[in-house]
Amino acid sequence: MENGRISSNHVRVKMKNGSISSNQDSGIEEKETAMYKVRLANAGDIPAMYEIYRPYADETTVSFEYGAPPAGDFAARISALFSVYPVLVCEEYGQVLGYAYAAPAFERRAYAWCAELSVYVESSARGRGIGSVLERAIAALLKRLGYRKLYSLVTQENTASVAFHEHVGYRQVAFFPEQGYKMGRWLGVVWLEKELCDAGCCEKFPLKMIELFDADRTLEEVFG
């Protein structure tokens, strides 16, 4: 923790043939191996995160926003999460290729052990395992913070995202038809759930990120 802010800790993640392992070397050893760095996001990352998100809101039904919000509003939205929930970026050679964060799933206090996942990957970097790396890190951090359930709400027609979530351990728990209207059509929403721990693991309210990183300053064991 530096000056009351969470430091930009990171872990290097090697992707080879679809597998994930932590690695402290720099560079790419062979063509089929990509080296990514997953780290805590900071205010300096927000412009890159905004540019990744903007096409999702402007051009797709992945986001139910009718266009990206003003950059300042987006920055305020992300900044409000930093001290409480994990907000991560995945970069390669200093370029942010994707980001993910957790946020409250519901408002009432009894839901405090539930969080909602959001993952966004730059269009040219999709299909390279970045979403899996980010999801794994978010889930691992939430488990350490003391969360029990992680949810993701996916537009029904986004079948690739539904398949992705099922591949990384989520199960469909609900489907709500015609919940949103965008781009001239009604859209159903699939609710997916990942259980992070059993009912006995959550005797206290979850920690905040700022509390976790007072005691533990590294992301390395997330991928241990």
For the regions a language model picked out, list residue spans one by one.
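Conserved catalytic-core motifs of GNAT/GCN5-like acyltransferases
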Residues: Y101-P104, Y151-V154, R171-G188, C197-D198
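Acetyl-CoA-dependent GNAT
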Residues: A68-S124, E135-R136, E195-L196
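Conserved GNAT-fold acetyl-CoA-binding loop/helix
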Residues: Y50-R77
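Conserved beta-strand-loop-alpha-helix junction that forms the acyl-donor binding cleft
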Residues: S152-V162
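Conserved GNAT acetyl-CoA-binding A-motif
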Residues: L142-V154
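A short beta-loop-alpha structural element at the N-terminal edge
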Residues: K37-M49
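C-terminal "cap" of GNAT-fold acetyltransferases
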Residues: E178-G224
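Conserved acetyl-CoA-binding loop-helix of GNAT-fold acetyltransferases
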Residues: G127-A140, A163-H167
